[in-house]
UniProtKB/Swiss-Prot annotation:
This is Cobalt-precorrin-5B C(1)-methyltransferase. InterPro entries: CbiD, CbiD_sf. Belongs to the CbiD family. Transmembrane segments: none annotated. The lineage of its organism: Bacteria, Bacillati, Bacillota, Clostridia, Eubacteriales. The keyword Methyltransferase applies.
Length: 381
């Protein structure tokens, strides 16, 4: 069993392996059994693969099905201490013997290796790409380039000479799980993606989330050079309420600075950021990662702006004693349009400075979760 750990602060966190590694291991194991490269399935309890990271990964085989001309192996996705939505999913690879003529025919419409001895497809629970701008061509299964290479490399290393196989990767629960991922936003329908660039899942990593944000900006910028950035699902719902189209909206989580950089690199012309005052106030004073562990400034922004506007210190202290920006806004009530105008203008200036004025930027700031209420906007009537 694969055991690898990283240090995170005072904690020791266990790494896992990607869906790409699972698919590779299952395909390799099925190929070994199909061509009798191991005596019996009872002897194949575990499979070892090489990862692009240069680290060998051993994975337990959860289930084996042997048919007349095929073998199917299942490996359970293990995410380590990064308890993502794919943890425990069955990743299956069905490897079937086919004739040379069949392989050559299938290679014209499926993924294949150079010698056309291996053809690869996605089955149930593996998404299909329906839009341009992704790493995978429109119409193909959502098996990303690195996992494709991994699967083909491992099978090529053991496939007997003059033998041909069709490999189908499936995820029985993938259809439902896929709906809870970024896939529908990216135009990937019907399941999850088989992912991974290193083969290893590193717990608590921001890399995967940033990669999704970058990919969504890249894909949506192909259709529109005017995008809407927001922080999460509540912000997205408010964007739709305001009339913005889903194909223009990108959820950037806490990584607003990173998202702005991606917009510039993808030649986006303009963005509108729509966000709750708690997140937006951080941007006003130069915080471009809005996570509370990185930037705890919120109430201080309101307090400082109230002070600069000449409000009484007793009111400033009441604001500082609130637990949240939401509470502070409710405490203040109506009549503080000048406060939100000042914060809003500083948000715009801060963001324009961050991107060296390479984007046209507008902002919409609101409060309230279940029933958002507009506080200030640079672009709405």
């Amino acid at each position: 069993m694969f055991e690898m750990y990283i240090e995170s602060g005072m904690n020791k966190l266990r790494c896992g392996y990607t869906t790409g590694s699972c698919a590779t291991g299952a395909a390799k194991a099925a190929t070994m059994l199909l061509f009798d490269l191991i005596n019996s399935e009872e002897e194949l309890n575990e499979i070892e693969i090489d990862t692009p990271k240069g680290i060998k990964v051993e994975m337990p085989i959860d289930n084996v099905v042997v048919g007349k001309n095929f073998v199917q192996c299942t490996i359970l996705k293990f995410s380590g201490d990064d308890k993502d939505i794919t943890m425990g999913l069955e990743i299956q690879a069905r490897v079937e013997k086919i004739r040379k003529e069949e392989a050559e025919g299938l290679s014209k419409k499926l993924i294949s290796n150079e010698s056309k001895t291996i053809v690869l497809d996605g089955g149930i629970g593996v998404g299909r790409v329906t839009k341009d701008g992704l790493f995978v061509a429109k119409g193909e299964p959502a098996i990303n380039p690195v996992p494709r290479q991994m699967i083909i490399k491992e099978i090529e290393s053991i496939l007997p000479k003059d033998k041909y196989v069709k490999v189908v990767i499936s995820v029985p629960q993938g259809t439902e799980i896929g709906k809870k991922t970024f896939n529908p936003r990216l135009g990937i329908e019907g399941g999850i993606s088989i992912l991974g660039t290193s083969g290893i899942v590193y717990p608590m990593s921001e890399d995967a989330l940033k990669a999704s944000i970058k990919l969504e900006i890249k894909q949506k910028s192909l259709k529109s050079k005017n995008l809407i950035l927001t922080f999460g699902n509540l912000g997205e719902n408010y964007c739709k309420y305001l009339g913005y189209k889903e194909e223009e909206i990108v959820i950037c989580s806490n990584f607003i600075g990173f998202a702005l950089e991606c917009c510039v690199s993808c030649n986006v012309k303009s963005i509108i950021i729509v966000g709750h005052i708690g997140k937006m106030s951080k941007i006003a004073y130069g915080c471009f990662n809005t996570h509370s562990r990185v930037c705890g400034v919120r109430l201080e922004v309101l307090a400082l702006e109230l002070t600069l506007l000449g409000y009484d210190i007793s009111l400033v202290n009441k604001v500082l004693n609130e637990k949240t920006c939401e509470g502070a806004v409710k405490l203040l009530g109506s009549g503080y349009e000048n406060l939100y105008e000042n914060i809003g203008q500083k948000i715009l200036n801060s963001m324009k400075t961050y991107v060296y004025d390479e984007l046209k930027i507008d902002a919409v700031m609101y409060y309230g979760a279940s029933n958002p209420i507009l506080l200030w906007s640079s672009c709405l009537e």
